[in-house]
Each structure stands twice: as C-alpha cells, then as structure tokens.
C-alpha cells in the first residue's frame, strides 16, 4: 500500500477533477502489476495495474489507495474489470466520498465473492486527496492561502518593493504548489503592481492553473502579461455594471468574465460560483486585502507561509493581512501546524484549520 500511495502522490496536479489514485497487484509475494491514474478521461490506476499483470491478476491481491469506482463516467467502472480479472482480494486505503461511489464499489466487489480489507494507511490516503474529498463533501473549493513574507510579516517594503523577499528555492517550491491547484486567485492591485504571469515553471513542465483576478471595477490593464500570454485561461470576477466596451475588449482576448453583483464580493458567494465552474482547489496569492477577506470569512483550509530571515519594519509597509482583521482573540482563526521545513534560507510553514 505504501508503494500505491507513492504512485498516486507522483500524479498530484494532473488528475483533477478526479482524485489521485495508485494501485499495486501482488501474487505469491511478488509485484506483478502497478499503475496510477494519470489524467481525467484516461484509464484509472486499477486498469493500468490489471493490464500490466495480465493473466497473473487471477487469484492476486490488489492494493488500491481509493475505493474502485462503480459507475460509468468517461471510463467504464473499475469494479467490473476487477471482477472479470479474477482478483481474489482487494485492499482499500480509503472509501470514495463521491455519491456515485460511496461504498457501492466495495459492496459490489464483496458481492462477487472477493475479499475486501479496508483502512490500510487510510490517513495517508485521505491527506493525499484532501482537496478532492473536501470539495466533494462541502460543495466548495479547498482553499490554500499562500504567503511569502519577512519575519515581521511584511510582504513588501514601504515603497512597494517585493522582489524578492524569499529565496530562489522557495519560489521554485511555489511553482509545485501552483501545479497542485486548479486555480490561482489574486486581487487586481497585485496585477497592477507586479504584472505577474502566475504560471507554473517546473523542470519538465507542469500544469498551469486557471488564473482568477478579483476586479470589481475592471481595472485590470488590457496589456497585462497574463491577458495575452495564452499560458492558461484567465477569469476576471467583476461587476455587471462595468463598461460594456471594456468587457468586450477582454472577451475578445479570451478572458472569461464572471459577473457578481456584490460590493464587496462575498467570499462565500465567490467560492460557490467557482465550485460550479469546476474548481476543486484554489490557491490564493493575493495581497493583504484579499488575504484579509478570506481570513474574516473563515473560508480557507490551510495557510502556506514562506518565511524569510529578514526584517523590513515600517508601519506603512504592506503586511500579509490588512484591512479590518479580527477584533477579538476569541474570534481569531485557530490553526494547527502541519509541517515546518527549511527551504534554502527560508522556512516553509504549513498550518491547517482546526
């Protein structure tokens, strides 16, 4: 099962809207087949493993990180393939919360006389697909707030200089973080100040997430890099009252305008809209104002902070969170440290909501 989890982990960022899944087939104490789900619409991990094992699948044990699917989607049900192959035992790490599966796969396997063992390395399997599980059950995206700051919580100097607070190694790690999310969200002030591309620059490539700009008054410069680079779709969340001609200029360039008649835009409403648009995981790379909006809404799942060993000072220097903030410690967002690691000269701190 540990190997199956490793196979699944290697595909993070590639399979959305499907979960990452790994499978290993063992017979007579030898691995005879293995596989991972590589991309939505392509064969699932179980099918790759069965194809590799061939006739050796009969009487073998399959270890799989997620309950095999029992429904017809882009591909046929994996349960039927397992039964037809004559697998004798299926060891499942975690059940699938998708209402189309949700225990049905396991019941179908048992009904065919195949032994099923559940819960092996379950916690590791759950963590591997945390955004998928959350979005399926809560009907909204899994939200990660990403922050790069000095020790005193500053994200730029008082003159606006921010390149670069963190080191090169941290910035490279951010590209993998982007790769594992469906979309990146920033505020229009970040676009105006930094003109970012928000793409993924990994060795050997990587997935470029959808880029979302919060821009109620449609102030995004038409000449901004991401508007014309064609690296990934750009969505602008704006007001339906914005200038019609300006809207047409963006639409001519392939920009999707999501019009929300709220001032300011409520984070809950935004997440509901994004979920309906197919976004399961959202990486927020906004400035202090956008971060503060998510903080006050309480609608975020984890925070990833890249902390550089420098002090900037100045009351006027932008902070990780700005705006009204939380008035009482009683209402402060309580988190738990999940992981702390050194990356170059920086610290990467991952904290999750309690």
Regions of interest found by a model, annotated:
Residues 25-124, 210, 230, 235, ...:
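Zn2+-dependent cytidine deaminase-like catalytic core
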Residues 21, 80-82, 149:
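Short, flexible segments with low predicted structural confidence
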Residues 15-29:
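N-terminal glycine-rich anion-binding loops that anchor highly charged ligand groups
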Residues 1-2, 7-12, 16-18, 34, ...:
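Enzymes that bind and transform nitrogen-containing heteroaromatic metabolites
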Residues 7-10, 52, 131:
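Solvent-exposed, charged/polar functional surfaces in cytosolic regulatory/catalytic domains
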Residues 99-100, 126, 291, 313:
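Generic structural signal for helix capping and beta-alpha/helix-loop junctions
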Residues 13-17, 41-42, 106, 120-148:
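Proteins enriched for Cys/Gly/acidic motifs involved in redox and nucleic-acid/cofactor modification
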């Amino acid at each position: 099962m540990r190997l199956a989890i490793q196979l699944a982990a290697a595909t993070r960022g590639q399979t959305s809207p499907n979960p990452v899944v790994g499978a290993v087939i063992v017979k007579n104490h030898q691995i005879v087949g293995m596989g991972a789900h590589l991309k939505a619409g392509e064969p699932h991990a179980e099918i790759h493993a069965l194809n590799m094992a061939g006739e050796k699948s009969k009487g073998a044990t399959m270890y799989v990180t997620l309950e095999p699917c029992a429904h017809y989607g882009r591909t046929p049900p994996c349960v039927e393939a397992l039964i037809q192959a004559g697998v004798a035992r299926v060891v499942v790490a975690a059940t699938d919360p998708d209402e189309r599966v949700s225990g049905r796969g396991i019941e179908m396997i048992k009904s065919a006389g195949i032994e099923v063992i559940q819960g092996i390395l379950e916690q590791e399997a759950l963590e591997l697909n945390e955004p998928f599980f959350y979005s399926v059950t809560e009907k909204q995206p899994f939200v990660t707030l990403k922050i790069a700051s000095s020790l005193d919580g500053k994200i730029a100097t008082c003159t606006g200089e921010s390149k670069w607070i963190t080191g090169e190694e941290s910035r490279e790690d951010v590209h993998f973080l982007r790769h594992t999310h469906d979309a990146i969200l920033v505020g229009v002030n970040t676009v105006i100040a930094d003109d970012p591309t928000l793409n993924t620059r990994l060795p050997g490539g990587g997935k470029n997430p959808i880029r979302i700009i919060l821009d109620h008054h449609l102030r995004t410069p038409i000449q901004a890099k991401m508007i014309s680079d064609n690296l990934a779709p750009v969505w602008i969340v704006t007001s339906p009252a914005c200038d019609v001609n300006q809207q047409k200029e963006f639409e001519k360039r392939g920009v999707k305008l999501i019009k929300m008649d709220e001032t300011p835009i409520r984070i809950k409403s935004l997440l509901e809209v994004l979920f309906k648009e197919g976004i399961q995981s959202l990486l927020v790379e906004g400035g202090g104002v956008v971060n503060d909006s998510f903080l006050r809404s309480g609608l975020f799942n984890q925070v990833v902070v890249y902390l550089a060993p420098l002090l900037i000072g100045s009351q006027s220097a932008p902070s990780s969170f700005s705006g009204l903030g939380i008035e009482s410690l009683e209402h402060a967002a309580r988190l738990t440290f999940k992981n702390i690691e050194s990356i170059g000269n920086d610290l990467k701190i991952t904290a999750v909501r309690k």
